[in-house]
Amino acid sequence: MFFGTFNHAIDAKGRTSLPAKFREALAAAGEPRIVLMQYPHWRAVQALPQSVWNELVKKVMEASPLDARWQRNVLKFVSSAHEVDLDVHGRVLVPPPLREWAGLQKDVVWVGMGRTIHLYDRAAYDEQMSAEIPADQVVDFFRT
């Protein structure tokens, strides 16, 4: 599982270090690589362990090829996916189309989201986090 927020930099080649805690979690789960794709709700990159990606692909393959709405989503988001390996320094190379999609500049933020990880441009992340959540949209995680 992935939790926490980590500030990092991305270099001119598109390389950024995956936080050590995330690398440790991947190693403990026996996950050799991650899949990067467009995050559909914000301008961010979503990173999924290979096993989570495989679950997603299985769902996609079970969908009807005649469902236009589903196919549009597959075309938009699943087709943006790139399998990537970490280099010996624990860095990932974010492909140019994903850097463009998320507007990744020099400063980036890795955010653990439980089973997945998000990668944001720092300015976009700060803006997203400063926005108020309307009271009727707040989820009560502690309700029993």
Swiss-Prot record:
It holds the Pfam family MraZ. It comes from the Bacteria. Keywords: Cytoplasm, DNA-binding, Repeat, Transcription, Transcription regulation. The keyword Protein biosynthesis does not apply. InterPro entries: MraZ, MraZ_C, MraZ_dom, MraZ_N, MraZ_sf, SpoVT-AbrB_dom, SpoVT-AbrB_sf. PANTHER family: TRANSCRIPTIONAL REGULATOR MRAZ (PTHR34701:SF1). It is found in: Cytoplasm, Nucleoid. One of its GO terms (cellular component) is nucleoid. Forms oligomers. Residues 5-50, 81-124 form the SpoVT-AbrB domain. GO terms for molecular function: DNA-binding transcription factor activity; transcription cis-regulatory region binding. It comes from Anaeromyxobacter dehalogenans (strain 2CP-C). Belongs to the MraZ family. This is Transcriptional regulator MraZ. One of its GO terms (biological process) is negative regulation of DNA-templated transcription initiation. PROSITE patterns: SPOVT_ABRB.
